[in-house]
């Protein structure tokens, strides 16, 4: 039977046949309209045309939804169920129970004791009395604390809002028990719904676990613990995995003799198959591997507890990474994914995978019929068929707050997690705070005496292990025996995305209405494919919503040789994906020396992204005399090189290269995106500039580079694409506007200008309001500069209006206290001053002046540079992104585009030139962080200030960079080599673009959004 919800039905429930529409009453229409508007905002960002299509996919009309949202009741024909909300609410009436002493560490724990004891009574009454022989009182208390902790975590934030006014804990508890808490539940019926749901999940999953433990205890002792004697359970620890499928999660079972085992409430046949495979391979393999021993049962199982232990000596660090490389070879062949830090435990010199559920992953389907997407899809397939897809190698992710974190089974820097903590719990001084979880144990890496091994130090060992084991697998047959017809987990979306939605659903501000609360989960609809009339994966969204509204992470499985995705209810959604077992067979057939060499190249590139060793400072010779031929030749050579690296399909091109992560200093191997900074728009702009030399192939390459982008701007999925991009002028939608505008000018192509205008109109008020970065690279400052460049070419009032909305957002926001062009005050000052010039608004000019004054206060006259405020230790950089170069360019640009105070600006330009000279030549040859940015400052200053010696200096320095490359074989990059550094701000396209600007001053300066 299903649970019956009384006071807070979700929108899915209300629109189902379980409910029926009632005649309307006064006020119902307003409530219905508010609910519908909230749904539209969540599902389509307020786009009513798109929202109507979303309704139609489920067979709804606006009129039907409004009628049901106005007034409805549970239908008499509705299926029978059980009403947990009734007895959960009734439990809080027990005042006597609340007077019992409580000395725990759960905030407001006193209030929840009646529910906990009522639920406990129901649980133990449903189990056999003999369970007391198996579970010691300490174990039963662990079970109890699990429910108490979950209930407290859910309710404490909303209770604290009320407690903060009283500040007397004893009086507050007396007031809330029972009347005050019951009134709270009446005011927020969703809170009661969630309390009932959590309690029901605890009852069902605990009953299931205890019953299974009682059934399997003898086998656990015999097959996993290797002990013949009986022992009782002393502790049960949870929190080792996200809750799935009705609150089920991994538990650690500790017996009174200290031995431990893991309970996993999911099918473990894939784990058992791995155990048999590794045991078979170890008999002949060049290096032995280890997996956890498994006791598989029907739909669940038990595994040995794998503890993190240190090496016997530092010599074992090398063997640890050889084994890690061997694991990568094996996992790559078996199409494993999601092998991040938490799924690997270092046991001495053995890296032990502890969760192999994402083995034999089916290929991701391409749902697009768009011919312009074929090149991108082909590039994405190359990445998904590489060792990067395993998740063992270091990579980077981006949090909701734009913080960059490292991921990967052999990564050393774990993501810093933020969590709610409480101080002075259950006292008058109790307070919550959000804290970073620091000093998390690096359990995935080998260690000795507190020192952890790193991949950077043992890369050759890792590569050796990979190569040796891959060649061993080439000569080994029947690898896939035992892997047919086994279920494997299918991760439909990143867990981090689900966590974001769960965070919203736990916010009590929407808990007064079940519909407005539940439509937050329909944010998923934004990610559907709206270019088609029907999205094959649309049915999965209902299952995702159902799980999320129970505060669970959605869970799906596929058969290893199948193509259908199965949800928790057993519903199968067919797909056209290539089955995982077929992919594994094909990989093993393709495995040869050439494939191994390519994968080793990928490994070394991934490892380079975590190498923080300082770049060698190479002397640069500036003695030669510059000639235009040298610059044209280098630009043409680079154009040819980038063109050869392209993946071409029909009229579109894509590249695999180093893409920046969240506008940060880190890069990783990926299919390049649409942006100007490191993506296709920047490459296209370089090709457009090179086309001015008369090169027809570069004109074709320029259009091919943005073909996919332009088609997406016109597609029904455009809102999702721009939401991922953000608004910024280097990495966001603003960068697209600027690139298309500049390309249209260089190529005399009005269609490109029309698409730039189309992109500008996608910068909606809602998207701008969501911008928290604010800077020129990723935020509103960059959007302003990009839009004003388009406005200069079109004079379109609607473009100017978008720019001024961005300026209002930037001027009214709390800007981050940083200096510099890319993320700091210089870029914001330039953008705001530019907006002030075109609008005549004093508030923008005042805000720009504040930014300049802030920057002046952080200038160090002795060093001739501005201090980098991102780090606590005194540090100075002379780059475009941070320091003198960018600040100087921003001030120079202000003299051209914006009204400014001449004396202050000119003084800053002089200081910037001094700082840039002291910082020359730096460690890299890029526009963003190195020599090319410094060259652009000299060139721009020479032209603006009519100082010929600066223009000459820029020319000589650029030639020196080219000559040094010719002597050493490559330019100096932030990460890796030229093969994957193809972008504009940090790659070859930037070198070529700088060369072209040397010979043609009509090519716009991209560093100031000219």
Predicted regions mapped to residue ranges:
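Generic alpha-helix detector with strongest preference for long hydrophobic helices that associate
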Residues: 104, 108, 176, 180-183, ...
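Glycan-recognition and catalytic cores of secretory/periplasmic carbohydrate-active enzymes
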Residues: 284-319, 330-368, 372-435, 454, ...
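C-terminal catalytic region of ATP-dependent kinase domains
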Residues: 2-171, 177-214, 350-636
């Amino acid at each position: 039977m299903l649970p019956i919800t009384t006071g807070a039905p979700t929108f899915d429930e209300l629109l189902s046949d379980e409910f029926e529409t009632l005649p309307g009453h006064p006020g119902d229409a307003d409530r219905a309209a508010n609910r519908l508007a909230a749904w539209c905002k969540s599902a389509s960002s307020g786009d009513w045309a798109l929202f109507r299509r979303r309704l139609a996919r489920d067979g709804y009309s606006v009129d039907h939804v409004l009628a049901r949202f106005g007034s409805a009741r549970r239908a008499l024909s509705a299926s029978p169920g059980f009403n947990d909300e009734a007895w959960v609410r009734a439990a809080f009436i027990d005042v006597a129970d609340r007077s019992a002493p409580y000395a725990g560490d759960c905030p407001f724990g006193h209030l929840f004791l009646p529910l906990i004891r009522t639920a406990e009574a129901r649980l133990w009454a449903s189990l056999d009395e003999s369970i007391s022989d198996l579970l010691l009182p300490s174990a039963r208390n662990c079970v109890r604390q699990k429910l108490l902790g979950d209930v407290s975590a859910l309710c404490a934030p909303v209770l604290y809002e009320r407690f903060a006014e009283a500040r007397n804990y004893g009086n507050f508890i007396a007031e809330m028990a029972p009347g005050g808490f019951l009134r709270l539940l009446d005011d927020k019926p969703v809170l009661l719904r969630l309390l009932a749901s959590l309690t029901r999940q605890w009852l069902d999953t605990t009953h299931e676990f205890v019953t299974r433990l009682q059934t399997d205890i003898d086998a656990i002792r015999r097959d996993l613990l290797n002990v013949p004697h009986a022992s009782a359970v002393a502790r049960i620890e949870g929190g080792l995995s996200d809750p799935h499928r009705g609150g089920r999660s991994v538990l650690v079972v500790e017996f009174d003799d200290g031995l431990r085992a893991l309970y996993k409430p999911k099918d473990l046949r894939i784990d058992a198959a791995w155990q048999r495979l590794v045991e078979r391979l170890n008999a002949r393999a060049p290096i032995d591997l280890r997996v956890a021993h498994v006791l598989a049962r029907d739909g669940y199982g038990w595994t040995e507890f794998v503890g993190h232990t240190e090496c016997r000596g530092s010599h074992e660090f090398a063997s640890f990474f050889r084994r890690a490389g061997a694991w990568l070879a094996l996992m790559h062949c078996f199409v494993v994914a999601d092998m991040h830090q938490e799924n690997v435990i270092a046991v001495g010199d053995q890296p032990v995978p502890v969760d192999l559920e994402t083995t034999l992953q089916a290929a991701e389907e391409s749902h697009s019929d768009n011919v312009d997407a074929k090149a991108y899809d082909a590039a994405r397939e190359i990445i998904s068929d590489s060792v990067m897809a395993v998740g063992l190698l270091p990579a980077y992710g981006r949090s909701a707050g734009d913080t960059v974190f490292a991921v990967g089974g052999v990564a050393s820097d774990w993501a810093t997690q933020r969590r709610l903590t409480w101080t002075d719990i259950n006292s008058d001084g109790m307070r919550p705070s959000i804290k970073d979880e620091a000093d998390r144990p690096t359990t995935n890496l080998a260690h000795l005496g507190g020192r952890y091994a790193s991949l950077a130090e043992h890369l050759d060992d890792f590569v050796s292990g990979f190569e040796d084991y891959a060649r061993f697998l080439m000569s080994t047959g029947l690898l896939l025996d035992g892997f047919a017809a086994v279920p494997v987990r299918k991760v439909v979306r990143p867990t981090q995305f689900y966590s974001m939605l769960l965070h919203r659903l736990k916010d009590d501000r929407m808990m007064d209405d079940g519909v407005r609360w539940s439509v937050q989960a329909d944010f998923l609809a934004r990610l559907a494919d709206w270019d088609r009339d029907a999205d094959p994966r649309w049915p999965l969204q209902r299952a995702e919503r159902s799980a999320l509204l129970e505060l669970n992470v959605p869970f799906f499985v596929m058969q290893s040789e199948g193509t259908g995705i199965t949800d928790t209810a057993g519903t199968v959604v067919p797909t056209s994906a290539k089955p995982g077992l077929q992919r594994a067979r094909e990989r093993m057939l393709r495995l040869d020396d050439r494939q191994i060499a390519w994968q080793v190249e990928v490994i070394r590139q991934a490892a380079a992204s975590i190498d923080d060793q300082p770049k060698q400072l190479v002397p640069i010779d500036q003695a030669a005399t510059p000639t235009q031929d040298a610059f044209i030749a280098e630009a043409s050579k680079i154009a040819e090189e980038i063109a050869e690296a392209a993946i071409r399909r029909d009229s579109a091109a894509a590249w695999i290269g180093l893409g920046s992560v969240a506008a940060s200093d880190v890069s990783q191997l990926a299919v390049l995106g649409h942006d100007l900074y490191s993506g296709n728009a920047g490459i296209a702009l370089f090709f457009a500039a090179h086309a001015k030399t008369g090169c027809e192939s570069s004109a074709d390459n320029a259009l091919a580079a943005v073909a996919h982008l332009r088609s997406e701007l016109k597609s029904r999925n455009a809102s999702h694409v721009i939401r991922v991009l953000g608004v910024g002028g280097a990495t966001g939608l603003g960068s697209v506007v600027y690139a298309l505008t500049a390309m249209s000018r260089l190529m005399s192509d009005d269609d490109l200008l029309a698409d730039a205008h189309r992109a500008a109109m996608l910068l909606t008020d809602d998207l701008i309001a969501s911008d928290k970065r604010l800077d020129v690279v990723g935020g509103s400052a960059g959007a302003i500069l990009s839009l004003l460049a388009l406005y200069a070419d079109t004079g379109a009032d609607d473009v100017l209006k978008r720019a001024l909305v961005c300026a209002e957002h930037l001027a009214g926001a709390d800007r981050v206290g940083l200096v510099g062009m890319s993320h700091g005050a210089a870029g914001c000052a330039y953008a705001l001053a530019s907006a002030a010039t075109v609008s005549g608004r004093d508030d923008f000019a005042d805000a720009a002046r504040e930014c300049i004054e802030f920057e002046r206060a952080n200038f160090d006259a002795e060093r001739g540079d501005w201090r980098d405020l991102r780090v606590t230790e005194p540090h100075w950089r002379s780059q475009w992104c941070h320091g003198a170069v960018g600040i100087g360019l921003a001030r120079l640009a202000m003299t051209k585009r914006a009204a400014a105070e001449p004396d202050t600006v000119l003084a800053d330009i002089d200081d910037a030139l001094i700082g840039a000279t002291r910082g020359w030549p730096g460690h890299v040859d890029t526009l963003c962080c190195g020599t090319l940015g410094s060259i652009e400052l000299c060139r721009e200053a020479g032209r603006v200030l009519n100082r010929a010696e600066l223009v000459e200096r820029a020319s000589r320095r650029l030639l020196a960079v080219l000559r040094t490359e010719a002597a050493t074989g490559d330019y100096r990059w932030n990460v890796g080599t030229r093969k994957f550094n193809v972008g504009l701000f940090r790659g070859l396209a930037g070198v070529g673009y700088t060369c072209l600007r040397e010979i043609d001053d009509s090519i716009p300066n991209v560093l100031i959004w000219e």
